[in-house]
Structures are given as C-alpha cells and as structure tokens.
Amino acid sequence: ASSVPSTAALLADACWPGPLTVLVPKADHVLPVVTGGRPTVGLRVPAHPLTLDLLERFGGGLAAPSANRFGKVSPTTADHVRADLGDLVDYVLDGGPCPVGVESTIVDCTVDPPQILRPGGIPDEQIAALLRNDVAPAAGPSRASGMLASHYAPTARVLLANSATEARQLASVNPGAEVLDRTDDLVESARHLYDDLRDADRRGVSVVVAVMPPALGLGHAIRDRLAKAAAAG
C-alpha cells in the first residue's frame, strides 16, 4: 500500500487475522496484473494456520487470486480446487474444509465513508460497530471480486424463496427441484453453502430452490451469494 487509511488500520487491528479484506491505495511497485489495473489493492491476513505458516516461511506478501473459474461456485476444499483447475496448477495445499465457507468481507477504505463492497465472513454489523456506523453499502462500478450481478453460479438453476412454505411451492411446480434450507443455523449455512450447490450439480439436480436467510450476521453474505447465483439463471 502507498498509504494506509485510518479506517483500514482500525479494521485490520480488530479483525486480522480473519476474513476481512481492506481496499487501500496501491504502492507504485505493485504490478497492474495484481490489481486488475486499478489504483487500489486488497489486503488480508487470513486466520488459517496453514496459510499463516506459508506466509511466515515465504517472508512476504502473496498475490493470491481465488482458486476457481470465473463466475462459478467457489471452492471450499482441496478436492473442489482439483476438480475445477485440474492440471492448471502444480500443487494444492490442503488445510481441510474452509471453516467459514463464504469469502472475506471486502471494505473499500479509500472512500469516505468506507463502503462494504462484498459482505462476507465478518458480518456487516461488526464492521458498522467498529466504524461507529460511518459506513455505506457499495455504490458505483465494480471495484472488487464478487461485485458482478451474476457470480458464484452452479450449473443448476437457482430460485429464491423467502420462506420454507414458498420454497416448497416453487419446488412443486419445477420438476426435479430440490429445496435448500439451512436458515436455522447461519454459521453452518455459510460453511456448507458452496458444497451444497456443488453437491446438487454432482447429483444432476436441475433446479435448487434456496430459502433466503434473515439479513443479519452471516445472513448478509449468504443472501448476497444466493442472489448472485440466482441471477445467472
């Protein structure tokens, strides 16, 4: 980074290591290929012990794009990465299933007030509390991974329902549809979301009717991913 805004430092101190990415002005030596040609760079310190060990052994920062094909369902296990990328990568570090499941929260700290570009593993409410509610939702053109309207999409068509009753009704008029409802436990829902969608594809399910969780805590991230998966259909 060429500079670290005070909001980025505050969030990093509170949430790192953990699933938070802060967008800050990039340093001049950072290559455009790392930032997609943008003047900003996303920084994160993950909490997984295997990744922390890798960073310590390497002794510097790593440019680490997502290990999945563009627009498709994110991987949460080493097997998912192998299935998606095959021989395109030489090695896969296997640290077990991702404990959070959904990606990191991305906060753009180059604007005032900061904007949550992508809800994720750090709930929006926690970000707002740390910034004393001086935070805004994403606005303007795409500036980070996962901001496109259609993303995280399985082969199966995804339909959204606001309740279990509505989900059953939608499933009844869509032959071959299955209902996905983990709204009773948001932590488990986030952890298994992508694996559930991948499992539906593995079994040849043509339509997934997903019950939207409440818009609180990890529910923000789950709703975001399901809405983007549904937009692809």
Language-model features: locations:
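Active-site-adjacent structural elements in enzyme catalytic cores
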Residues: 1-233
